Regions:
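Bacterial N-terminal signal peptides
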Residues: 4-16
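Beta-propeller-forming repeat regions
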Residues: 18-415
Length: 415
């Protein structure tokens, strides 16, 4: 384990994002390509939250002290050849999650490696200055938009993702960690059948998935670009989940990123917010009607004129929800994933890597709008964007790790 200090904090005022005096201050933690996902937790239990991206923890409250909780990867070849190349390659840290998995009071780190690789658990050594123990807990974690959420309702989060292989085929489901021994092998519980169609649909690079209570029965359901899977009354038999087809990607797109489930219009029914193509264009929300069907409401399209504010950008590869302006309504954040497929691989790969939050506004007539608020035009998102209160002021902040570097966007006090 190595400790080091950042010579100076690099602070810049992000481009004004003013809605009810919401303005963000940008802190550059590093310009190195470390990861495309990150997590936030108080790893050292000093009362201040920390940021982890790649193999490094930046310690709060000023994030100038660094700890390597595990040695850097040494990959002589492959898509994640080291040092990680932002223009041509990827990293071994696609997404990252923090949770006290072993119940000892110290947050651990779950690393979702490249899709199709093992999911890794790094166990916190309870403040000791030594490398964290590393455990491969799930042999093949597929999909590009997994999540960590308590699906079973037992208070312990599961990793919802996909998995594939000769024996399993392509299946959607969730990996359950062993409560008695979280560092042991997790058990995958598929919710879809094995079919030739699913073998092609659910594989390492499948895009677009999320989790939330779609039908209001108090149980967590799973959504994909093709519809949603209803959690049954009981999970005891390990059976398949009923599927409700919905085209959440109009026009047959490849699918987006994290799909958000919350009540947009205030009618008491859960709606869905999603990007349409993680490597192209499109963003929208889908209103759930009283009969359970969904109606599309486009937010962004392929042209600036598709949005009232003229906003248009590509590669919306990460979304996260939060009430940024404190009005009691759920907003969300997304942006452009810089060089998702390199410098020439996707539409407009070299356009400004923007980061936006979308303010939810409800009208008295029942109308709804998501107003885009530009936070920054030199960062964007990775395959994950993390929302957390990094300075304990009660306001949601934003943390990003991607091919541009690692950033914190901290809300400034009003006025």
């Amino acid at each position: 384990m190595r400790l080091s200090m950042v010579p100076a904090i690099v602070l810049a005022l992000a481009l004004p994002a003013v809605a009810n005096d919401v303005v963000f201050e940008k802190q550059f933690l590093t310009e190195r390509f470390m990861a495309e996902g990150c997590a936030v937790a108080d790893f050292d239990r000093d009362g201040h939250v920390d940021v982890v991206a790649g193999n490094t923890i930046w310690h709060g409250p000023d994030f100038t002290r660094l700890t390597e909780y595990t040695p850097p990867r040494d990959n002589p070849a492959g898509p994640a050849k080291t040092p990680y190349d932002p223009a041509r390659g990827y990293s071994n840290y696609f997404l990252m999650f923090a949770h006290d998995f072993d119940g000892d009071g110290w947050h651990d780190i779950l690393v979702y490696d490249l899709p199709g690789e093992p999911a890794l658990l790094f166990v916190n050594p309870r403040g000791e200055a030594k490398p964290w123990s590393k455990h491969a807990i799930f042999a093949r974690a597929d999909g590009e938009s997994p999540g960590l959420i308590d699906i079973t309702g037992d208070g312990v989060p599961e990793l919802f993702c996909q998995s594939s292989g000769p024996e399993l085929g392509g299946r959607l489901g969730f990996a359950v960690l062993d409560k008695a021994s979280p560092s042991g092998e997790a058990t995958f519980r598929p919710i879809t059948p094995r079919t030739p169609e699913n073998d092609k649909k659910y594989f390492r690079y499948t895009h677009g998935s999320g989790a939330g209570d779609v039908n209001g029965d108090g149980r967590v359901d799973i959504v994909t670009k093709d519809g949603w899977f209803e959690q049954p009354d009981s999970l005891d038999d390990g059976g398949l989940w009923p599927f409700h087809p919905v085209d959440f990607v109009p026009g047959g797109g490849m699918g987006g990123a994290q799909m958000l489930v919350f009540d947009v219009d205030g009618d008491g029914r859960s709606d869905v917010v999603t990007s349409y193509n993680a490597h192209g264009y499109g963003l929208g929300w889908f209103r759930q009607e009283s009969d359970g069907s969904f109606t599309e409401h486009r937010i962004l399209g392929k042209r600036p004129e598709d949005n009232p504010e003229g906003v248009c950008f590509t590669q919306l590869h990460a979304l996260a929800a939060a009430d940024f302006d404190g009005d009691g309504l759920t907003d969300f954040v997304t942006g452009k994933r810089r060089w998702a497929h390199g410098m020439k691989g996707d539409p407009e790969p070299n356009a400004a890597p923007v980061l936006y939050w979308f303010r939810l506004v409800r009208g008295g007539d029942g109308g709804v709008a998501f107003e885009p608020q530009l936070i920054d035009d030199d960062s964007g998102v990775g395959t994950q964007v993390t929302v957390a209160d990094v300075n304990a002021d009660g306001k949601p902040d934003i943390v990003v790790a991607n091919k541009r570097g690692v950033f914190i966007f901290r809300q400034k006090p009003a006025g």
